[in-house]
Amino acid sequence: MRAVDTNILARFYLRDDAVQGRISADVLSAGDVFVPKTVILELEWVLRYVADQPEDKVLDCLAHLIALPGITVEDRDEIEAALRHCRNGIDFADALHLAASKSCSEVLTFDDRGYARRAKKLRLKPPVQVPTAKQQIPRRTRPTDS
């Protein structure tokens, strides 16, 4: 199995370099390819903010990527959940953080206007909370060395 970096996938989807585009297509079509979730996160950023692609097109590219035969995606279920959350208005990076935190009791953020409010409206789990100065944050106690 071979892992790919973001630039291989960017060239495949953007087709902005004919030679590298063909090579990247050959790499992906050969199969036995591993895509780390950090590469998917970076690809979303490159497509949206560097290549200035609309969000729906970017999400379609990511959905296409994870559905390709011969492609193994790290934590695929988290990527799929992040895509669903993102299509409902959550920023992709935040959506991926939320999906990766599925076993936690809550996600803490200072982004009240965007992330926390949207997540609450969508009733996403774990709940996304904004900690306040008045709120008591439970502290874990460490076992003492004896």
Region locations from a protein language model:
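Alpha-helix capping/helix-boundary segments
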Residues: I8, V39, E78, L96-H97, ...
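Acidic, PIN/NYN-like endoribonuclease modules and their adjacent C-terminal/linker elements
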Residues: M1, L98-S146
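Acidic catalytic patch
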Residues: D60-R87
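Short beta-strand scaffold positions
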Residues: V4, V35, V73, F92-A95, ...
